[in-house]
């Protein structure tokens, strides 16, 4: 069984009164233990595909299955994004902001999958600046341990086992002193 499966994935962005389709009908599967690379020229949709696989961005259409869970099963993706009536001001300009509103059940499903199955390394530096390396690694584990629906094996670790695991990870990537 594939750990990641995309089927007929699409993503469109509004551009004025037009719509730009950044991803058009992408389908592929990644099996457990398989190495995959997404390549292409700038603007070809690579980051958009990764953001959808990482459950950071919603597809406009299609399906994503992660470790057997159909992420958007039972959800009409075209209804998920709505206009928000809040206004934000920056530099005196008032602009309407869009935000994605997800049904509570889907939000829980996505959060659970992110915590138990996904890891994401961004191009930009996205650590929590007030935390050290150890604490940045520990933080998602603390969140996960509070989630009753979590299925991570780390949930069963004792405090000392978690400390050992975090130190192992730090050493593995060469960040020890």
PLM features: residue spans?
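Conserved beta-strand
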Residues: 6-9, 21-31, 62
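Conserved ABC ATPase "signature" region
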Residues: 69-73, 145, 150-177
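Helix-to-loop junction immediately C-terminal to a conserved catalytic motif
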Residues: 54
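Conserved ABC transporter NBD signature motif
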Residues: 62-100, 150-154
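The feature captures the beta-strand-to-loop junction immediately N-terminal to the Walker
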Residues: 39-41
């Amino acid at each position: 069984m594939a750990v990641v499966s995309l089927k007929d994935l699409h993503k469109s962005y509004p551009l004025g009164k037009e719509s730009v389709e950044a991803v058009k009908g992408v389908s592929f599967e990644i099996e457990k233990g398989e190495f995959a690379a997404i390549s292409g020229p700038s603007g070809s949709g690579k980051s958009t595909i990764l953001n959808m696989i990482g459950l950071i961005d919603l597809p406009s259409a299609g399906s994503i299955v992660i470790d057997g869970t159909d992420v958007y099963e039972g959800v009409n993706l075209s209804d998920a994004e709505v206009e928000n009536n809040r206004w934000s001001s920056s530099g005196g300009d008032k602009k309407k902001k869009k935000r994605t509103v997800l049904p509570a059940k889907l939000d829980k499903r996505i959060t659970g999958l992110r915590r138990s199955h996904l890891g994401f390394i961004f191009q930009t530096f996205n650590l929590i600046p007030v935390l050290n390396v150890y604490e940045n690694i520990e933080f998602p584990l603390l969140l996960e341990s509070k989630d009753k629906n979590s299925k991570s094996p780390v949930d069963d670790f004792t405090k000392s086992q978690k400390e050992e695991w975090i130190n192992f990870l730090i050493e593995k990537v060469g960040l020890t002193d």
